[in-house]
Amino acid sequence: MAEKKADKRAEKRKFNTEAWEPKTQIGRMVKEGTISDISYIMDKGLPLLEPEIVDALLPDLEEQVLDVKLVQRMHKSGRRARYRATVAVGNKNGYVGVGMGKSKEVGPAIRKAIAHAKLSLIKVRVGCGSWECGCGSPHSIPFAAKGACGSVKVELLPAPRGVGLVAGNVAKAVLGLAGVKDAWTKTFGDTRTTFNFAEATFDALNNLNFVRCLPNQKEKLGLTEGRVL
């Protein structure tokens, strides 16, 4: 019975490409089948302006709500309260995104955060950069990286196979959705702020893409970008 309900929920969540009416040129190219791989969009530096593009090209994308909080701001008529949701999305195979959404209700806030996370999707570099391992398989990160958001700073370090994700719950969720299985982390600042913590981890993963490597170094580190086949 539980399996049938899970299958029905999966069918409801399945993206219907035929019913989708794209608003941008890239969206139309995706629907027509001209673009069939999201890595093409990212390699060309084309803008992701519709979350439906990600739904169509990455059907195995998973979502995880990291935090929902009630926030307030002052207005001339008094205090105004809204819900703020922080969400991470990823396919556990080289793609990850982090987003935040606000609304008067929890549901719309989470949906806004999911859409924002899909639009901020990046390709993640994975590999084996630990001197203790050197297996050459893409289970960790290829080299150390740093990221920051607000007062939070995160440093990611390659770890040997079997160590797992030595990180806080928020960083562990982001790294797991990115497809990183083994890594050490160092954190500084007020990590209780969930969005800043998630965004700093996301920034560190993004900074991996700006390191230049020679072909022989890529082979030694087992460096892979995006989806691992």
Swiss-Prot record:
Gene Ontology molecular function terms on file: rRNA binding; structural constituent of ribosome
A Pfam family hit: Ribosomal_S5
Gene3D superfamilies for this protein: 3.30.160.20, 3.30.230.10
Xref: PROSITE patterns: RIBOSOMAL_S5 (PS00585), S5_DSRBD (PS50881)
Domain S5 DRBM, first and last residues per copy: 61-124
One GO process term, biological-process aspect: translation
Keywords, in A-Z order: Ribonucleoprotein, Ribosomal protein, RNA-binding, rRNA-binding
Function of the molecule: With S4 and S12 plays an important role in translational accuracy.
Domain note: The N-terminal domain interacts with the head of the 30S subunit; the C-terminal domain interacts with the body and contacts protein S4. The interaction surface between S4 and S5 is involved in control of translational fidelity.
Subunit structure: Part of the 30S ribosomal subunit. Contacts protein S4.
Protein name: Small ribosomal subunit protein uS5
Underlying gene: rps5
